[in-house]
């Protein structure tokens, strides 16, 4: 079967194909398999857990190497998803009410947070190690010019937006939490030479601000 994605899975490797998720050990021996019937499958992995989802239908299944931990449906098509250290999972959804929506579930698959983004697509998500916040990359277009926003949301606050920085003429494509107070955003600057693949920007932030290190 065609391999759509391959990623480390604890000390093993998880392969996503058009009809299954296969976990192989270091000797390439199959140690787990989950069959799926998703028409447009994708997956997010954190250490020994895999979140397999259908981008079209919104169906998802959470598994480890020995069993299925749970499943559900987001109610909307999925752009992308992420998993956190404490079992938190987050989806970027395509909804009728907004351009995109962040939907967050706890380890019991109970919905704990939602945030609508009116103008931009939530392109990438990283959940903080403590499970209390998420860093997002939003991508939009204004007057035929692409821009990105780096947004940090706190799940517990009435006003969840902790940080919101806009980058004109820039495509941010990957965001990663270094720690609970530090994130790394990877970008491609359209003004730079095409040969340069991209550059990395590190940020550390306190309770309310995000500052370039």
Question: Model segments located where?
Answer:
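N-terminal "mature head" segments of proteins
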Residues: 1-56
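Hydrophobic/aromatic beta-strand positions that recur at structurally equivalent sites within the blades
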Residues: 16, 24-25, 53, 61-63, ...
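Loop/turn residues immediately N-terminal
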Residues: 18-22, 56-59, 67, 96-101, ...
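Extracytoplasmic/luminal low-complexity segments enriched in Pro/Gly and acidic/polar residues
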Residues: 141-213
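Short, solvent-exposed loop/turn segments at conserved positions within beta-propeller repeat blades
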Residues: 15-16, 53-56, 94-99, 142-148
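Hydrophobic beta-strand positions that form the internal "hydrophobic ladder"
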Residues: 13, 50, 88-90, 131-135, ...
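A short beta-strand motif characteristic of beta-propeller blades
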Residues: 1, 27-35, 66-73, 110-116, ...
